[in-house]
């Protein structure tokens, strides 16, 4: 059985669809995860969201052990979590960072990024579609490219 792609989300992503839809869009996290599962074919998707930094770090460690790739929207932890950065540095699998909005075009405090330096790439500002692009990259980089 092939290893899954992990799709992990940080704080407040459980509010997608209702929280600042003019910035984050109207898709819920469940909508996004359902689309990824449909696009992944026979590759399993492990999709989780948490508002807890420690839990997110534990899931990154699990993905490092059990996953083929990691798609991560760390949300606000992108800008604050050295613990998350340190966990991500241990990955031997591709890490694709995703943001629904473009943090570089927003408030100055969002310009600090502890995830990007350890990611293969970052997709930002494309809304929910960014997750689909991230899945395509994750599959290609982990050897499961779709034609």
From Swiss-Prot:
Q: Which reaction does it catalyse?
A: 3-dehydroquinate = 3-dehydroshikimate + H2O
Binding-site list for substrate: 73, 79, 86, 100-101, 110
Any idea which UniProt keywords this protein has? Amino-acid biosynthesis, Aromatic amino acid biosynthesis, Lyase
**Positions of the catalytic residues:** 24 (proton acceptor), 99 (proton donor)
- UniProt xrefs under PANTHER family: CATABOLIC 3-DEHYDROQUINASE (PTHR21272:SF3)
Which NCBIfam families does the protein's record reference?
aroQ, PRK05395.1-2, PRK05395.1-3, PRK05395.1-4
Name the family the entry cites: Belongs to the type-II 3-dehydroquinase family.
Instruction: Output this protein's name.
Output: 3-dehydroquinate dehydratase
Q: Which organism is it from?
A: Hyphomonas neptunium (strain ATCC 15444)
Gene from which this protein is expressed = aroQ
């Amino acid at each position: 059985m092939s290893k899954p792609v992990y799709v992990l989300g940080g704080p407040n992503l459980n509010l997608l669809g209702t929280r600042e839809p003019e910035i984050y869009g109207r898709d819920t996290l469940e909508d996004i995860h359902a689309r990824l599962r449909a696009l992944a074919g026979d590759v399993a998707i492990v999709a989780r969201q948490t508002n807890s930094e420690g839990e997110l770090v534990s899931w990154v460690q699990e993905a490092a052990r059990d996953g083929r790739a990691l798609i991560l929207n760390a949300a606000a932890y992108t800008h604050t979590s050295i613990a998350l950065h340190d966990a991500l540095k241990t990955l031997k699998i591709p890490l694709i960072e995703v943001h629904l909005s473009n943090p570089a075009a927003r408030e100055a405090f969002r310009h600090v990024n502890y995830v990007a330096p350890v990611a293969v790439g970052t997709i930002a500002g494309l809304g929910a579609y960014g997750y689909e692009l991230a899945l395509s990259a994750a599959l290609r980089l982990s050897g499961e490219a779709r034609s």
